[in-house]
């Protein structure tokens, strides 16, 4: 699967789940479960409830995603 196939959306962290998983509400109102990307994990980027994030979704499963950026 190529990187161009991913859908990027903005969202807000609703709650923190175990194993660095998060419940994220997207701009369109959908709620997805997302995990942190490897680069964010490697650089110890902290994500807290209420943070604005960018989430990548695949067209195959729109209920799960990957957090790739935390807005300031």
UniProtKB/Swiss-Prot annotation:
Coiled-coil boundaries: none
Pfam families according to UniProt: eIF-1a
Gene3D superfamilies tied to this protein: Nucleic acid-binding proteins
Keyword tRNA processing in record: no
Localization in the cell: Cytoplasm
Keywords (A to Z) from UniProt: Cytoplasm, Initiation factor, Protein biosynthesis, RNA-binding, rRNA-binding
Chief location of this protein within or outside the cell: cytoplasm
GO MF, one example: ribosome binding
One cellular component term from this protein's GO annotations in UniProt: cytosol
SMART domains: S1
Domain S1-like, residue spans: 1-72
Family: Belongs to the IF-1 family.
Biological role stated in the UniProt entry: One of the essential components for the initiation of protein synthesis. Stabilizes the binding of IF-2 and IF-3 on the 30S subunit to which N-formylmethionyl-tRNA(fMet) subsequently binds. Helps modulate mRNA selection, yielding the 30S pre-initiation complex (PIC). Upon addition of the 50S ribosomal subunit IF-1, IF-2 and IF-3 are released leaving the mature 70S translation initiation complex.
Assembly and binders: Component of the 30S ribosomal translation pre-initiation complex which assembles on the 30S ribosome in the order IF-2 and IF-3, IF-1 and N-formylmethionyl-tRNA(fMet); mRNA recruitment can occur at any time during PIC assembly.
Stored HAMAP family: IF_1 (MF_00075)
PANTHER family reported in the protein's UniProt record: TRANSLATION INITIATION FACTOR IF-1, CHLOROPLASTIC (PTHR33370:SF1)
Protein name: Translation initiation factor IF-1
Organism: Shewanella pealeana (strain ATCC 700345 / ANG-SQ1)
Lineage: Bacteria, Pseudomonadati, Pseudomonadota, Gammaproteobacteria, Alteromonadales
Gene label: infA
């Amino acid at each position: 699967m190529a990187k161009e196939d991913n859908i990027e959306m903005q969202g807000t962290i609703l709650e923190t789940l175990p194993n660095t998983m998060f419940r994220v509400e997207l701009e369109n109102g959908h709620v997805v479960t997302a995990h942190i990307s490897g680069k964010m994990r490697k650089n110890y980027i902290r994500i807290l409830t209420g943070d604005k994030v960018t989430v990548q979704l695949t067209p195959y499963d729109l209920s799960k995603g990957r957090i790739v950026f935390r807005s300031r």
